[in-house]
């Protein structure tokens, strides 16, 4: 599922089954991903991000989405600190809500 990542100029797709993740990863990078783990967040050559979360596990989703949020804030040059924590938390909330809507 492709998520709405506005207002930031990044692209994110979340994949919930390993076979689909491997197919998309291999198409983008030309190689197979390393051995399966519960979750993976990877930057693709086109600048987009692909996330895999095994069994739609909410804890894994939160973990992997945090990787994406950290990447996004670094990409736009916004440090993650007390001054910007609200922006970070609202962004994380938005991404998690979109994902949970689909898996429920």
Regions found by a protein language model. Give the residues of each.
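Surface-exposed, interaction-prone regions used to assemble/regulate multi-protein complexes
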Residues: 10-12
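Short pre-active-site segment immediately N-terminal to the catalytic Zn-binding motif
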Residues: 45-61
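Catalytic zinc-binding patch centered on the HExxH motif and its immediate surroundings
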Residues: 1-4, 17-47
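Substrate-binding clefts and substrate-entry loops adjacent to catalytic sites
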Residues: 71-79
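Active-site recognition of the HExxH zinc-binding catalytic motif
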Residues: 59-71
């Amino acid at each position: 599922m492709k998520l709405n990542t506005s207002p930031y100029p990044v692209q994110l797709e979340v994949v919930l089954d390993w076979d689909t993740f491997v197919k998309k990863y291999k198409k983008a990078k030309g190689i197979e991903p390393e051995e399966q783990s519960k979750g993976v967040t990877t930057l693709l050559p086109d600048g987009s991000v692909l996330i895999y979360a095994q069994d739609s596990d909410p804890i894994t989703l939160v973990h992997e989405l945090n990787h994406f949020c950290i990447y996004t804030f670094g990409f736009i040059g916004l440090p993650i600190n007390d001054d910007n924590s609200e922006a970070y938390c609202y962004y994380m909330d938005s991404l998690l809500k979109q994902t949970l809507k689909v898996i429920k």
